A protein has these predicted regions:
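Flexible "cap/lid" subdomain of the alpha/beta-hydrolase fold that forms the substrate-access gate
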Residues: 1-3, 15, 61-97, 101-295
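Conserved HGGG/HGGXW glycine-rich cap/lid loop of the alpha/beta-hydrolase fold
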Residues: 18-65
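Active-site helix-initiating loop/hinge in glycosyltransferases
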Residues: 31, 74, 100, 310-311
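Active-site loop/turn elements of alpha/beta-hydrolase fold enzymes
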Residues: 58, 125, 302
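Glycine-rich phosphate-binding loop signature in dinucleotide/nucleotide-binding domains
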Residues: 21, 89-92, 326
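Catalytic active-site module of serine/aspartate enzymes centered on a nucleophile-bearing elbow/loop
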Residues: 292-326
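A short loop-to-beta-strand scaffold at the N-terminal edge of the catalytic core in hydrolase folds
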Residues: 10-19
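Conserved beta-strand scaffold positions in the cores of enzyme catalytic domains, especially
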Residues: 3-7, 53-55, 296-299
Length: 326
């Protein structure tokens, strides 16, 4: 199906944005390593429900502009991109829904621009205030000599070289090792006491297993589309979001101590690795204390990290029911 894209001038750059449907706008924000295409299963159901669907390629991705400076990928810059899209469309306000990195982007858009955001929904990554020490320092303390991907991503060039060597293989490994099937396999491996965790000198893809077949949620044509998007963009811009985490902490620490005021919805899969992001802590259990008006908190059984792609019908129903009651 042919889609309607507009190159939207916003915040000094141009953002490739899918805009379809009529009604109250809903902004969908993708994560890493993804694309507007990650929301392909949401477009028609939301249009039919009477919403204007707005799905940008976040700066650095796909056909959107790719600023060269690392600091150009801060939460403050990206949230300004989104508000600029609303300004361009002459929309007073909107609902916002984000997955993976798109979730923090959505949470902070609601905090930075409360008058522009009617409701906020996050998939996979709940809202939590920043710690009193910077994220990179915190992760070094938590993971010590073990490998942690965010620390691996910090130095420009190293992760790019590994991940861009064979884009299709990279994406296949990432998608298929973090979905429900991949996570079950990882849990089985973790029970094998002879297997040692990766040390901090490992690479990102090291230890990931090649799937025999693509999972049902990811068709060959889907993988091809994502692959072509990253052949266009490379990994530099997308990885810079991780490199701005300490900058985000500096700029937004005080703001992060506020609770989300808008009607809120949080959805994740029972097998999403983000639930176990911090050793010994289940993040889903703590969801609720950082929101003033959390209407929905859903854990979908047998779903991994790619929430709205692995369980589109369930996610669409939860989100549309939530929005209908606002």
């Amino acid at each position: 199906m042919r889609r309607n894209f507009i190159e939207v001038p916003t915040n000094g750059i141009k953002i490739n944005t899918l805009i379809e449907g009529e009604g109250k706008p809903v902004i969908f924000v993708h994560g890493w390593p993804e694309s507007w295409y990650s929301w392909r299963h949401q477009i028609e159901p939301f249009k039919k429900a009477g919403y204007k669907v707005i799905i940008p390629d976040i700066r650095g991705y796909g056909n959107s502009e790719k600023p060269k400076k690392v600091n150009s990928y801060s939460l403050r810059e990206i949230t300004n991109d989104l508000i600029g899209i609303l300004d361009f469309l002459k929309e007073k306000d909107a609902h916002i829904i984000g997955h993976d990195w798109g979730a923090p982007i959505s949470w902070y858009t609601s905090l930075l621009f409360p008058e522009r955001i009617l409701s906020v929904s996050g998939l996979s990554v709940p809202f939590n205030p920043f710690n009193e020490i910077s994220p990179v320092t915190l992760f070094k303390d938590l993971y010590k000599d073990a490998f942690f991907y965010i620390l691996y991503f910090q130095k420009v060039g190293i992760a790019e070289k590994e991940l861009e060597n064979n884009i299709k293989k990279t994406l296949r490994l990432i998608y298929c090792n973090s979905d429900s099937f991949g996570m079950k396999k990882m849990i089985d491996n973790a029970s094998n006491k002879n297997l040692k965790p990766k040390d901090k000198n490992s690479t990102f893809l090291e230890g990931m297993t090649e799937p025999e077949n693509l999972p049902k949620w990811l068709k060959e044509e889907d993988l091809e589309y994502f692959t072509n998007e990253f052949k266009k963009s490379g990994m530099y811009g997308p990885l810079n979001k991780y490199r701005c985490m300490d900058l985000d902490w500096q700029e937004l620490f005080k703001l992060s101590l506020n609770k989300i005021k808008q009607p809120s919805c949080f959805i994740t899969g029972s097998l999403d690795p983000v639930n176990f992001f911090i050793p010994g802590v289940n993040l889903f259990d703590s969801v609720g204390e950082n929101y003033e008006n959390l209407k929905v908190k859903e854990l979908i059984d047998d779903v991994g990290h790619w929430t709205q792609q692995e369980a589109p019908d369930q996610v669409n129903k939860i989100l549309l029911d939530f929005l209908e009651k606002i």
